[in-house]
Amino acid sequence: MIPPLNRYVPALSKNELVKTVTNRDIQFTSFNGKDYPLCFLDEKTPLLFQWFERNPARFGKNDIPIINTEKNPYLNNIIKAATIEKERLIGIFVDGDFFPGQKDAFSKLEYDYENIKVIYRNDIDFSMYDKKLSEIYMENISKQESMPEEKRDCHLLQLLKKELSDIQEGNDSLIKSYLLDKGHGWFDFYRNMAMLKAGQLFLEADKVGCYDLSTNSGCIYLDADMIITEKLGGIYIPDGIAVHVERIDGRASMENGIIAVDRNNHPALLAGLEIMHTKFDADPYSDGVCNGIRKHFNYSLNEDYNSFCDFIEFKHDNIIMNTSQFTQSSWARHVQ
């Protein structure tokens, strides 16, 4: 018997670019005439939150360094998720120059809620996703220099050469460059890295209670302003990936506030990483996620973007989405 689709059901567009069909024991969805399997995330697929803190000193030295105010109860949202989803592992992916007492507070949080696992960025090996900055700049310089002089962007060429010469010894690394950012890029880049690891992230962190996960298990990332109201249950996602979609004035936009994958090294995120390895000015959000997904599904600008967003959207009735937009604190940016 084919299980019913969960609350995630790709919507039908007016021009029928998107449709859902079933075939024997496999369910399919399609975009623009091509079928993709609906991959199943079971009720034990781990959830992952993230908190990268620029300034741990703004918190008490013995407090959990995650914002938890009346307007922005991010820590409470995570704890609520752990309480509702007791059968799931709940990861909190963290980075920052934390005080010893703050790390102790994280450990106490893990003790109080056995399914919460605090995963420190510097405990995870992301080197397999790295590339030398010098190689990225040299490849782009060579591309410019190979063009006929009349088509060459001389200003860009000089800029690339300057950026190449400014790389400091020991910092010739794409991954390290985002450790110096401490802004959106820091958050977004390492979120992508974590979701490339997916369930393997929990195994690599060597946390008690994580050993039942397979090295290829999936993961669901949620921003800390996403509020879980009831258990999520099993979820189907197209070709093993789905993301949050914002809609403003009828215009849809893919967002990285939710990223769900059914396995590690998902091809769409690897496609985004390839762009990060190729473009000298790549953005981890618009290129690493959005353009990687577009590339994976062969989306072109000739196709209906809103329909594509319907197709790739992570939908669920038991999540109140992006609540920080109501408190002027959302990190959301809109790209098409």
Curated annotation (Swiss-Prot):
Its main location: secreted. It is an enzyme of class 2 (transferase). Its EC number is 2.4.1.-. Auto-glycosylated: arginine GlcNAcylation is required for activity toward death domain-containing host target proteins. One of its GO terms (cellular component) is extracellular region. UDP-N-acetyl-alpha-D-glucosamine binds at residues 50-52, 74, 224-225, 324, 329. GO terms for molecular function: manganese ion binding; protein-arginine N-acetylglucosaminyltransferase activity; toxin activity. Changing residue 244 to A: Abolished protein-arginine N-acetylglucosaminyltransferase activity. It catalyses: L-arginyl-[protein] + UDP-N-acetyl-alpha-D-glucosamine = N(omega)-(N-acetyl-beta-D-glucosaminyl)-L-arginyl-[protein] + UDP + H(+). Changing residue 51 to A: Abolished binding to UDP-N-acetyl-alpha-D-glucosamine. Protein-arginine N-acetylglucosaminyltransferase effector that disrupts TNF signaling in infected cells, including NF-kappa-B signaling, apoptosis and necroptosis. Acts by catalyzing the transfer of a single N-acetylglucosamine (GlcNAc) to a conserved arginine residue in the death domain of host proteins TRADD and, to a lower extent, FADD: arginine GlcNAcylation prevents homotypic/heterotypic death domain interactions and assembly of the oligomeric TNF-alpha receptor complex, thereby disrupting TNF signaling. Belongs to the glycosyltransferase NleB family. This is Protein-arginine N-acetylglucosaminyltransferase SseK1.
